[in-house]
């Protein structure tokens, strides 16, 4: 199953959602292999597991640019050279700052969007779950991820600016559904403070819009908290994988993950 996390707005917890859904899958499906492919040049997926993306020897860009394994070699860096095992049953394929120039690189024919797609397809042959963390835009990397996905998760912060962007993403996804009729989409509110009137109003409006557009809307949400960043800072793990997680926040991600699996008609047992 390929799951993309998409929003053209930054700061909505895309990476936090991707890494914690991955952590939840570790607990819900311990026998199944999972991998997160980082398509966001900020490299926050590897940072979420205590890695500095700028100090990693091999990353996604090295595969795309066909970098030799060593000087003078005719053998190029491959997927296996880049994978990092970050938890039992969970790997990541990291990226770094250079991936921010993907559209420029593609326009200069350094590599093609189809090369990225091929990497995703290769991962899907080896892993039960492939999670794609995408950059905050709707450019080539994101469109490639969406075109390959079984489920697209759209985390959004329920503020006054979110609705227009959400509907534009939904409209874009509709074009992919023409070729992939089984594609599922789910909206998930993040940074929610239920005591804030604006948050409740925006969530209600988003639910209505989602229903009109035949898009699933999560029954659960991610609460506003600093505990996720604290987990990464102190334990170098997403909150869903730390040794003594807050039960409330762990359960939020577990329930959201169950919804994603149900949406894709995936039987956990």
Curated annotation (Swiss-Prot):
<protein>
    <recommendedName>
        <fullName>ParA family protein MG470</fullName>
    </recommendedName>
</protein>
<dbReference type="InterPro" id="IPR050678">
    <property type="entry name" value="DNA_Partitioning_ATPase"/>
</dbReference>
<dbReference type="InterPro" id="IPR027417">
    <property type="entry name" value="P-loop_NTPase"/>
</dbReference>
<dbReference type="InterPro" id="IPR025669">
    <property type="entry name" value="AAA_dom"/>
</dbReference>
<comment type="similarity">
    <text>Belongs to the ParA family.</text>
</comment>
<dbReference type="Pfam" id="PF13614">
    <property type="entry name" value="AAA_31"/>
</dbReference>
């Amino acid at each position: 199953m390929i799951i993309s996390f998409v929003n053209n707005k930054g700061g909505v917890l895309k990476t936090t959602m991707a890494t914690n859904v991955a952590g939840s899958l570790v607990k819900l499906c311990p026998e199944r292999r999972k991998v997160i492919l980082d398509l966001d040049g900020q490299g926050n997926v590897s940072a979420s597991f205590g890695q500095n993306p700028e100090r990693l020897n091999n990353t996604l860009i090295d595969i795309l640019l066909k970098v030799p394994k060593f000087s003078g070699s005719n053998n190029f860096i491959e997927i296996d050279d880049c994978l990092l095992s970050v938890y039992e049953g969970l790997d990541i394929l990291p990226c770094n700052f250079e991936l921010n120039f993907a559209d420029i690189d593609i326009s200069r024919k350094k590599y093609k969007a189809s090369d990225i797609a091929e990497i995703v397809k290769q991962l899907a042959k080896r892993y039960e779950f492939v999670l794609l963390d995408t950059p905050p835009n709707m450019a080539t990397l994101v469109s490639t991820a969406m075109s390959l996905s079984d489920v697209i998760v759209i985390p959004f912060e329920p503020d006054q600016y979110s609705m227009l962007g959400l509907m534009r993403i939904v409209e874009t996804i509709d074009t992919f559904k023409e070729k992939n009729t089984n594609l599922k989409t789910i909206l998930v509110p993040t940074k929610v403070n239920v005591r804030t009137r604006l948050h409740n109003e925006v969530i209600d409006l988003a639910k209505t819009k989602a229903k009109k557009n035949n898009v699933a809307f999560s029954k659960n949400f991610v609460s506003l908290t600093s505990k996720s960043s604290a987990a990464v800072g102190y334990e170098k793990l997403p909150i869903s994988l730390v040794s003594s997680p807050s039960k409330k926040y762990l359960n939020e991600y577990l329930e959201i993950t169950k919804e994603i699996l149900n949406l894709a008609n995936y039987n956990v047992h």
